[in-house]
Amino acid sequence: MQTLYPEIKPYARHELAVEAPHVLYVDESGSPEGLPVLFVHGGPGGGCDALSRRFFDPNLYRIITFDQRGCGRSTPHASLENNTTAHLIADMEHIRDFLGIDKWVLFGGSWGSTLSLAYAQAFPERVHALILRGIFLCRPEDFHWFYQEGASRLFPDYWQDFIAPIPPEERGDLMQAFYKRLTGTDQIAQMHAAKAWSCWEGRTATLRPNTQVVDRFSDTHRALAMARIECHYFVNQAFLEPNQLLRDVHKIAHLPGIIVHGRYDVICPLDNAWALHEAWPNSELQIIREAGHSASEHGICDALVRAAAEIAQRLLDLPPEEA
């Protein structure tokens, strides 16, 4: 069982001004001469942390992490202005150009897999390979499953807490009801809705209860950004065309991909990964038997660390023992 690499500090930090009012936080760690990899975080609105750097051998990889618009250390916090998928794709290209990188590996989980796929399909010539976890295709049925009916039947106790801020007469369209509160002027109602939204995700993210994950999702600062930005994206169908990611998978058919997905992922059910793998013959699908959605689960963590080592071995032409 592979574990995370030891915690490391960035060797460079950047504040990158993009379209107003946004300033992105970007950092670099590992080897400045290593294989560039971009860690694409989830949410949207989740942000990066010290854990984000630890899936990669710092002697082999130049590790780039960034907080997407409105979250983490990027500013302004929880802003929805000029915040769409197209903006985030443009930001990734801006970061690549700013750092002088020709091509890089994309490493993304959950919404990070969505954004990685969308970017790779827009700029396939800039991508070496993709390592994806917890695939989220952002189809209408995917939103309905987690935010209207589906996961609710597996976790009725957690679901009751999730819908508590919404009066019964508005529960026919929960995403719209949450959006009204998350974008409203009543700050108490906004925070109540944000905590309920974020905690629902945190409590269902792992196969076995994990208080550390729940506590991270319950953090007030994080919850506000994630709930507002996620809801903003999801009521707009992630600013993607219908079935866009599967429709355009031919654009990355030549790229290698490793897909890691938990068998019991309730947030992004396994059929997301299965459909992507079926459409992308150059991908490898690893189904983790005893895991849900979170990258912190042992089986998923092991598979991701191994995947990063395998991609480095292939691209750097290393003997197996060095990767």
Show where each model-derived region lies.
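Conserved HGGG/HGGXW glycine-rich cap/lid loop of the alpha/beta-hydrolase fold
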Residues: 18-76
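Conserved acidic catalytic loop of the alpha/beta-hydrolase fold
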Residues: 86-104
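Conserved alpha/beta-hydrolase "acid-adjacent" motif
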Residues: 241, 266-272
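Short beta-strand/loop motif that positions the catalytic acidic residue
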Residues: 252-253, 259-261
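Catalytic active-site module of serine/aspartate enzymes centered on a nucleophile-bearing elbow/loop
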Residues: 283-323
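A catalytic-pocket lid/entrance helix-loop region that shapes and gates access to the active site
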Residues: 125-178
